[in-house]
C-alpha cells in the first residue's frame, strides 16, 4: 500500500485537499494558521481497480515555536516514509526563502514530489503559477480546492503511482460452483466475526490531561504530538493496534476546554468529541491525577452518559501510593455517580504503568458492552428479582406485571420488559439493573430497560 503525504506551510489548504480526496470533512479546517497539528492517516480507494493508498496529512511547516518545530520534524519524518509527496503552496503569495529551503530539503530525500499550487481560483490567476517554477519542481499542478478546480486532474495523476489490484478468479474458473445462499451465509458469518473483534475507543478529557501521551503509550510509538501548550491535539487521530486477537482503534480527541474559553477551533473540537462518542464503543475518560477532578471533568462524563458508551475512567500521571489511590478512587465514584459501573484505573503514560492492563480492560468492557443474555436465563433472573422485591402498583393501585423479558439490542445491552403497562418506576428499574449486575459481569457498560405494553412499540422506561 503506497503512502501519499501532503506537506506545506500552515494555511495553504492541506487539510482541505485531504478532505476533498476523502470526500468528507474529516480534518478540522480553519483560517487560523497551523490548525492541523498532528499527522492524520486515512486509507482511501481512488478507483475500484486500484489498491488503496494511505493518505497522510501533516502539520504546517513553519518555524515559530517549540510546538511547530515538533510538527516540522514529524512532517519531514513522514516525507521519508512516503512514496509520493504533494508539496502544497499558496498561489496568492510568492515563495519565500523558508519555503524554498523546505522544498530543497524534500528534494534531497529523493522522493517523487508534485508541487501543488493552491488557490488558483480562475484563469487570470494562472500567471501566479510561474513564480513557483524557481523551486525546480518536476511537476506543477495548479488547483483551487475551495472551487474544486484542477483537483480531479491531480487525483488522476496520483492514480498513476498506485498499483492495480491483483486479478481475482471468476466463479466459472473453479471446477465446483458454490451455491449463492452458502456464499451469503459465509459472508454474514464473516461480518459477524469481524464485528466481534473490532473495538472503537474514544479517548476524551479536558485539555492537557495527557490524552495524547496516553495514546502514544497505548500504540507504542509517538503518533500524536505532545506539548505543554494547551490544546496541542486538535484533530482526532485514529490509530489501530492488535491486542489479544482484537483490533482496537483509538481516537485521540481534542481536549475540551471550559465553555468560557472555547473559541474558534475549540468549538470544532468540542463538536468532534461529541461525534466521536456517537461512533465509539468504549470511552476512556482521562482525568489528571495531579490536578484532581474539576467540574468540567464531570460535564465530560455527562457526555459519555448521554451517548451510552462503555466507559473506563483513567487517572493519568499517577505516582502516589496505594493509600492515596483508594482515597482518590473514592472521590472518583463520588463525583461520577452516574458512571458508578465504570472500572477505574490509575496509569502513567510516561512510565507505561498499567498500560497493558488498560488494553485488557478495554476488551473486557467491550465484551460486557456487547453481551447478550439468553432469554431463558434473563427471564429466570427477572422472575427471581420480582419475587425478592415485588413490583410497585400504579397510581390507581392496580397491579403492575412483567410477563416476560427479552434482550433485543447490544452495545449497550438493552432489555425489553413486556408488561401490562408501558412505564416502569425509575427506582424499580434501578433495582433490576443492580440485580442483573450481581448475576452477570456488566462492569463498564450501562444497562437499559424499556417497558413495552403488549401491542405497543418500545418506549424507554
Swiss-Prot record:
One Gene Ontology term from the biological process aspect of the record: ribosome biogenesis
Residues in EngA-type G domain copies: 2-166, 199-370
Claim: Repeat is one of the keywords in the record: yes
GO molecular-function terms, A-Z: GTP binding; ribosome binding
Signal peptide: none
CDD domains, sorted: EngA1, EngA2
SMART domains membership: RAS
UniProt keyword list: GTP-binding, Nucleotide-binding, Repeat, Ribosome biogenesis
SUPFAM superfamilies per UniProt: P-loop containing nucleoside triphosphate hydrolases
Domain KH-like: 371-455
Chain residues that bind GTP 1: 8-15, 57-61, 118-121
Annotated binding of GTP 2, by residue: 205-212, 252-256, 316-319
Listed PANTHER family: GTPASE DER
Role this protein plays: GTPase that plays an essential role in the late steps of ribosome biogenesis.
Family, per entry: Belongs to the TRAFAC class TrmE-Era-EngA-EngB-Septin-like GTPase superfamily. EngA (Der) GTPase family.
Assembly notes: Associates with the 50S ribosomal subunit.
Name the UniProt record assigns to this protein: GTPase Der
Amino acid at each position: 500500500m503506497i503512502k501519499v503525504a501532503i506537506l506545506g506551510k500552515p494555511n495553504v489548504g492541506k487539510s482541505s485537499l485531504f478532505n476533498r480526496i476523502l470526500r468528507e470533512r474529516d480534518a478540522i479546517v480553519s483560517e487560523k494558521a497551523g490548525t492541523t497539528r498532528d499527522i492524520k492517516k486515512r486509507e482511501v480507494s481512488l478507483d475500484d481497480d486500484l489498491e488503496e493508498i494511505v493518505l497522510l496529512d501533516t502539520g504546517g511547516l513553519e518555524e515559530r515555536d517549540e510546538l511547530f518545530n515538533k510538527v516540522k520534524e514529524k512532517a519531514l519524518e513522514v516525507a521519508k516514509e512516503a512514496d509520493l509527496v504533494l508539496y502544497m503552496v499558496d498561489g496568492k503569495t510568492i515563495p519565500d526563502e523558508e519555503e524554498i529551503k523546505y522544498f530543497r530539503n524534500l528534494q534531497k530525500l529523493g522522493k517523487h514530489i508534485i508541487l501543488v499550487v493552491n488557490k488558483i481560483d480562475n484563469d487570470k490567476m494562472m500567471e501566479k503559477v510561474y513564480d513557483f517554477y524557481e523551486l525546480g519542481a518536476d511537476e506543477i499542478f495548479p488547483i483551487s480546492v475551495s472551487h474544486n478546480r484542477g483537483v480531479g486532474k491531480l487525483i488522476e495523476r496520483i492514480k498513476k503511482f498506485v498499483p492495480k489490484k491483483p486479478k481475482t478468479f471468476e466463479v466459472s474458473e473453479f471446477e465446483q460452483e458454490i451455491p449463492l445462499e452458502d456464499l451469503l451465509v459465509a459472508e454474514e458469518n464473516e461480518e459477524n466475526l469481524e464485528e466481534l473483534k473490532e473495538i472503537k475507543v474514544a479517548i476524551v478529557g479536558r485539555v492537557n490531561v495527557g490524552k495524547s501521551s496516553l495514546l502514544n503509550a497505548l500504540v507504542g510509538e509517538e503518533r500524536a504530538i505532545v506539548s505543554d501548550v494547551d490544546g496541542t491535539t486538535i484533530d482526532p487521530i485514529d490509530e489501530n493496534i492488535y491486542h489479544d486477537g482484537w483490533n482496537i482503534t483509538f481516537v485521540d480527541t481534542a481536549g475540551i476546554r471550559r465553555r468560557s474559553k472555547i473559541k474558534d477551533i475549540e468549538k470544532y473540537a468540542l463538536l468532534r468529541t461529541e461525534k466521536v462518542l456517537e461512533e465509539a464503543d468504549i470511552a476512556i475518560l482521562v482525568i489528571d491525577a495531579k490536578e484532581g477532578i474539576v467540574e468540567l471533568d464531570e460535564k465530560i462524563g455527562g457526555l459519555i452518559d448521554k451517548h451510552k458508551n462503555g466507559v473506563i475512567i483513567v487517572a493519568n500521571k499517577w505516582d502516589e501510593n496505594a493509600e492515596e489511590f483508594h482515597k482518590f478512587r473514592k472521590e472518583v465514584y463520588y463525583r461520577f455517580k452516574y458512571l458508578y459501573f465504570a472500572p477505574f484505573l490509575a496509569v502513567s503514560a510516561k512510565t507505561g504503568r498499567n498500560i497493558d492492563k488498560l488494553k485488557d480492560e478495554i476488551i473486557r468492557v467491550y465484551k460486557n458492552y456487547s453481551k447478550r443474555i439468553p432469554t431463558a436465563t434473563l427471564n429466570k433472573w427477572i422472575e427471581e428479582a420480582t419475587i425478592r422485591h415485588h413490583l410497585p402498583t400504579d397510581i390507581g393501585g392496580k397491579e403492575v406485571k412483567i410477563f416476560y423479558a427479552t434482550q433485543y439490542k447490544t452495545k449497550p445491552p438493552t432489555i425489553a420488559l413486556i408488561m401490562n403497562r408501558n412505564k416502569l418506576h425509575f427506582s424499580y428499574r434501578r433495582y433490576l439493573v443492580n440485580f442483573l449486575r450481581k448475576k452477570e459481569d456488566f462492569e463498564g457498560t450501562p444497562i437499559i430497560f424499556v417497558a413495552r405494553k403488549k401491542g405497543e412499540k418500545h418506549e424507554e422506561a
